[in-house]
Each structure stands twice: as structure tokens, then as C-alpha cells.
UniProtKB/Swiss-Prot annotation:
It comes from Pseudonocardia autotrophica (Amycolata autotrophica). This is Vitamin D(3) 25-hydroxylase. It catalyses: 5beta-cholestane-3alpha,7alpha,12alpha-triol + 6 reduced [adrenodoxin] + 3 O2 + 5 H(+) = (25R)-3alpha,7alpha,12alpha-trihydroxy-5beta-cholestan-26-oate + 6 oxidized [adrenodoxin] + 4 H2O. Belongs to the cytochrome P450 family. Its cofactor is heme.
């Protein structure tokens, strides 16, 4: 648990009531303590909460993904840069090389071609949901669409999807270290076996494309790089979108004026999804960075060798960037937010997440115009994760289907 005191108020960070509504704590930090050193289980971490600081930090080469900057200089050469060659844990030129290779398969055109299939999945799920009685919308809808999409995209067999989703949740939530290590081992082993099957029985899915991809110099992804990339795509490819859908649906259910606007003009769904990403960001904090040298943000100097977290959810509600940040407005232009990062680490799957959000939320409210929460807001339970923000469950009454 980390505690911040601002004025006469105390705010728990990453514990207690924080999970239900973190925004008062973020607002207090932005106003009076925007570069805050926190005591977390993995060690002290500096949290940046202002939009300008977070956006600048994404492109600051002094903030490295190389954990060895926390070690004395004479010990660094004997240690591996990262325990697994995952792109989001790398600096250039290693990051540049992997991004170039993967980008050949993960194109905007390929993502846009998925829209008919995403719509088919959403409509099929909606057709099977009852009109009465409580339904857990997270489990039966928000979770199902991204999982089916990313598994089909990568070529993961349907019978394996529940296992991989369970491992992913353990890795993303604030689970015990032993549980995380066990889940990582199981996921690594599963993906290694799956990639071997793809070598002998290739298909038209993304994993087979990654096996075949090479650049003009003949460079290819190694086996460990392939496993790490598959792991990243599987986890990031559904965790963000599940929470985008859930948070977006809840935002509309709790803001009837905005729900009415969308019902009257369904073309607002694109700007609505951008606003959902800003208003209740599905990714709360970016992965840890390490200071390669002293850095200064908002007048506070962070020494070399320290860990730094970039507060995406806090930055996206910064009034210095977005007027009236605590008001939901699906007609505003929320582009420019740091929902998916910024710079060289901008999320490779941002286009797909936005597309899934537009289809899932748009089809849901068009199909079930009387959709309503089945419990009070104080009964909703959020996941306890420093990385993502989303509901564990969302009991709803679906209501009759539209004519």
C-alpha cells in the first residue's frame, strides 16, 4: 500500500477504496505532488501524473526499459538486459528491430479487414443473451469478443482459450509472485508448443506470418523472440480491450445524457470510444521505466537508477490538457490522449482495440436499448491491478432486443 497526503486529505494508492475510484487521488497528486515517490511491494517507484510530464517521458531517452540501470555500473555487463526478449521491455536498437519485423504482419489494413468478423462475433453473443435475469456482461460479452478476436487472429485453438485467459489475468492483476511465475511458465510452454505446431502446419493466422517474416537482410525472429511476441500480443491484445468495453459500457449506463446522444446519432461511436479511453483509461500505468541518469519533471529531480511509472489514467484527466476532465462528453475531440502510450512504444494494437470497442459498444446499445445495471454502483468490484483498470464483474439486465 502507498499513501499520499495532500492538504487535509489522505488518499490510499493501489489499495482500499482506490480501486473503486482512483481519480480523486490522481487529482490530488497532479495538483500538489505530481512526481511522487511511492513504496510498492517491488520497491520504491516514482509516479508521474501530469499529462505534459507523461507525454514527454514517453520519448525521453534517459528513461530506459533496461532494468540494469538500477545496478552499480560494474555489475551491469554480466546481467541480461531483460529476462524475456519482449518488445515493450526493450530500448532501441533492439526495440526498433523487433517493431520493424512485427509491423510487417500487424498492419492497419489487416486490422480493418477484421471488422465484419468482429461484428459477427458481437451479434452472435447478443443473440444468445437472455432478456431477463442478471447477466455478467464482463464474462459473457466484454471478455468474449477480444478473446475470440485475438485467438482467431493469432491462430490459438478455441479449446485453449480459457487457459490462456486465466494465465493472462494472473500476470496482469496484482497476484502473488509465485502465482505470476507459475502462470508465466505455463503460458511460455504453451506458446512454445503452439509455435512448433505452426512450423509444421502453417495457416493464414498471425503466428504463422511471424514465423515466416524476414527483412531485406534476411533477419528473422528467434524462437524466444517469437514466444515473447506471441505472449505480448495475447495478453495486450485482449486485456486492454476487455476493460475498454466494460468501462465504456459503464460510462454510458451512468451518464444517461450521453447514452441518449449516442442512441440519436450512432456515428458518434468513434469519438465516444476516444472519450471512454480518456475518461476511464483501461491501462492505468505504463510498464516501468528506469532512469539512466538524473531526470527532472515538474521541478522534481529523480536520481539515476530509479524506477518510474507513467500514470496514463491520471494524465488523461489533466485539466491542463483537457478542459472539464471529470465530465464525460462523447462529442469532444479526445484524440491526443496517452491511452496507448506515445512515441516508439505507441501500442501496436491500438487500431484493433479501437475497432473492437466501436463494434462491441455500438452493437450492444443498438441491440439492447433497455440495458441496465442489476446492482448498485457501490456493489461493483474492480480488479486490483496497478497496470489495468476494469471491472471483475458487471451484473446487468439486458432487456428486450430492439425491433
Amino acid at each position: 500500500m502507498a499513501l499520499t497526503t495532500t492538504g487535509t486529505e489522505q488518499h490510499d494508492l493501489f489499495s482500499g477504496t482506490f480501486w473503486q475510484n482512483p481519480h480523486p487521488a490522481y487529482a490530488a497528486l497532479r495538483a500538489e505532488d505530481p512526481v511522487r515517490k511511492l513504496a510498492l511491494p517491488d520497491g520504491p517507484v516514482w509516479l508521474l501524473t501530469r499529462y505534459a510530464d507523461v507525454r514527454e517521458a514517453f520519448v525521453d531517452p534517459r528513461l530506459s526499459k533496461d532494468w540494469r540501470h538500477t545496478l552499480p555500473e560494474d555489475q551491469r555487463a554480466d546481467m541480461p538486459a531483460t529476462p524475456t526478449p519482449m518488445m515493450i521491455l526493450m530500448d532501441p536498437p533492439d526495440h526498433t528491430r523487433l517493431r520493424k519485423l512485427v509491423g510487417r504482419s500487424f498492419t492497419v489494413r489487416r486490422m480493418n479487414e477484421l471488422e465484419p468478423r468482429i461484428t459477427e462475433i458481437a451479434d452472435g453473443l447478443l443473440a444468445g443473451l437472455p432478456t431477463d435475469g442478471p447477466v455478467d456482461l464482463m464474462r459473457e460479452y466484454a471478455f468474449q469478443i477480444p478473446v475470440q478476436v485475438i485467438c482467431e487472429l493469432l491462430g490459438v485453438p478455441a479449446e485453449d482459450r480459457d487457459d490462456f485467459s486465466a494465465w493472462s489475468s494472473v500476470l496482469v492483476d496484482d497476484s502473488p509472485a509465485d502465482d505470476k511465475n507459475a502462470a508465466m511458465g505455463k503460458l511460455h510452454g504453451y506458446l512454445s508448443d503452439l509455435l512448433e505446431r505452426k512450423r509444421t502446419e502453417p495457416d493464414d493466422a498471425l503466428l504463422s506470418s511471424l514465423l515466416a517474416v524476414s527483412d531485406e537482410d534476411g533477419d528473422r525472429l528467434s524462437q524466444e523472440e517469437l514466444v515473447a511476441m506471441a505472449m505480448l500480443l495475447l495478453i495486450a491484445g485482449h486485456e486492454t480491450t476487455v476493460n475498454l468495453i466494460g468501462n465504456g459500457v459503464l460510462a454510458l449506463l451512468t451518464h444517461p445524457d450521453q447514452r441518449k446522444l449516442l442512441a440519436e446519432d450512432p456515428s458518434l461511436i468513434s469519438s465516444a470510444v476516444e472519450e471512454f479511453l480518456r475518461f476511464d483509461s483501461p491501462v492505468s500505468q505504463a510498464p516501468i521505466r528506469f532512469t539512466a541518469e538524473d531526470v527532472t519533471y515538474s521541478g522534481v529531480t529523480i536520481p539515476a537508477g530509479e524506477m518510474v511509472m507513467l500514470g496514463l489514467a491520471a494524465a488523461n484527466r489533466d485539466a491542463d490538457w483537457m478542459p472539464e476532465p471529470d465530465r464525460l462528453d462523447i462529442t469532444r475531440d479526445a484524440s491526443g490522449g496517452v491511452f496507448f502510450g506515445h512515441g516508439i512504444h505507441f501500442c501496436l494494437g491500438a487500431q484493433l482495440a479501437r475497432l473492437e470497442g466501436r463494434v462491441a459498444i455500438g452493437r450492444l446499445f443498438a441491440d439492447r436499448p433497455e440495458l441496465a445495471l442489476a446492482v448498485g454502483l457501490d456493489e461493483l468490484v474492480y480488479r486490483e491491478s496497478t497496470l489495468v483498470r476494469g471491472l471483475s464483474r458487471m451484473p446487468v439486465t439486458m432487456g428486450p432486443r430492439s425491433a
